Regions:
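Short linear clamp-binding motif
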Residues: 3-15
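Intrinsic-disorder/low-complexity linker and hinge segments
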Residues: 17-19
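Short, positively charged
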Residues: 24, 28-162, 170, 174-367
């Protein structure tokens, strides 16, 4: 005969079972119950929904990634695993199949927020998509894949194309934080610039009937000819020493510019310019306005880079302190962004023994 304790135990078990049913959700696949999860387990529910959505749209997502030139099954799988986490897959695929985002639309907009709005991706996944890259030769930098995926007519370049990404068959360059204004061609050996600048001063002195300073004996430190944010290096030291003996004339400074441009053309291969590194920059007393000198030199470098690479435009991508993207389609737009403080010089040209071809150029990044 059942005791009072037996009834109490059965009643408690029945209550627990009822409570369990109320607190859980069944997970079914094709009518088969695979198990249960707690109603409060929002994370697992989201993962299951993502898996179901991903499975339903896997072919479409992977087909899109293949069409825009994502190389290799591993990379396509990585892209799929990111995109499958969209909370609105129909909206995401609708956008990817009819992309509308233009380069000009990126200025002032947070790329993570744009990705969330257009693809309905969680913020953490949108960030992963923004910085998604892989090892390759030449390297695939952060932001390049995101731009190829999000922009109207965006694609990855094929083996016959030299841009970092393509928009409607036009080549675009992408520069991340601290990237150098230099490409794969058109630049000489930065280490030799010490010799070229030294030679420029010697030739200049000979042209104006002056004796070159005694300290130009080749024994200086390898960074002596570097011109940074505050120091004009041996160039500034040489000019001030010469002007101390006898001030320059405007004609002298015009000749100096000729020799300086000639020196830089040894690094910026086949470079010609009408810009002057001395007019309004170097005083008759030999003092260099370093800010003006670097601003003109930056314009020379960028113009050479643009003409050599023949790209449609350049994207600057920032992902360290803040997520930003800026598009520039002309030298004027780039320099305007520099002058307005949107772009800053992250590093100045270095001509040391450790400098490679790109080390002799300016490094830039968004502010």
């Amino acid at each position: 005969m059942a005791t009072q304790g037996d009834f109490r135990a059965r009643f408690a078990a029945a209550l627990n079972e009822a409570k369990g049913k109320a607190d859980t959700l069944e997970v079914q696949l094709g009518g088969e119950v695979l198990g249960k999860i707690l109603k409060t387990d929002v994370k697992t529910q989201a993962e299951i929904k993502s898996a179901v959505n991903g499975a339903a749209f896997e072919a479409d997502i992977k087909s899109f990634l293949n069409e825009i030139g994502i190389p290799g099954d591993d990379n396509i799988e990585t892209g799929f695993q990111l995109l499958r986490q969209s909370t609105k897959p129909e909206q995401m695929l609708g956008y990817l199949n009819s992309r509308t985002l233009l380069p000009k639309d990126l200025s002032g907009n947070d790329p993570i927020s744009l990705t969330q709005d257009l693809l309905a991706l969680p913020a953490n996944v949108a960030k992963k998509l923004f910085i998604w890259s892989w090892k390759s030769t030449p390297s695939t930098g952060r932001g390049e894949v995101w731009l190829s995926l999000m922009l109207k007519d965006g694609k990855r370049p094929d083996s016959t194309q030299k841009g970092d990404m393509m928009i409607d068959k036009a080549e675009w360059e992408v520069k991340g934080d601290g990237a150098r204004i230099a490409g794969q061609k058109g630049f000489g050996d930065a280490k030799q610039m010490r010799h070229h600048l030294n030679t420029a001063i010697v030739k200049f002195c000979g042209d104006i009937g002056r004796k070159a300073p005694d300290f130009l004996d080749g024994s200086a430190a390898d960074n002596a000819w570097n011109i940074g944010k505050k120091s004009a290096g041996l160039l500034g030291k040489s000019l001030e020493a010469l002007a101390k003996e006898k001030k320059f004339t405007k004609k002298d400074l015009d000749k100096l510019n000729t020799y300086l441009v000639e020196a830089y053309s040894k690094y910026l291969l086949n470079f010609t310019t009408k810009l002057s590194l001395t007019k309004g920059v170097v005083g008759l007393d030999g003092k260099i306005n370093i800010a003006k000198y670097n601003r003109i030199l930056l314009e020379m470098y960028y113009t050479h880079y643009e003409n050599t690479e023949e790209f449609k435009g350049i994207f600057l991508v920032s992902y360290t302190n803040a997520n930003k993207v800026l598009a520039c389609t002309t030298t004027k737009e780039f320099l305007s962004a520099v002058d307005s403080g949107k772009i800053k010089i992250a590093a100045y040209p270095s001509f040391t023994d450790a400098a490679g071809a790109q080390g002799g150029s300016f490094a830039i990044q968004l502010v």
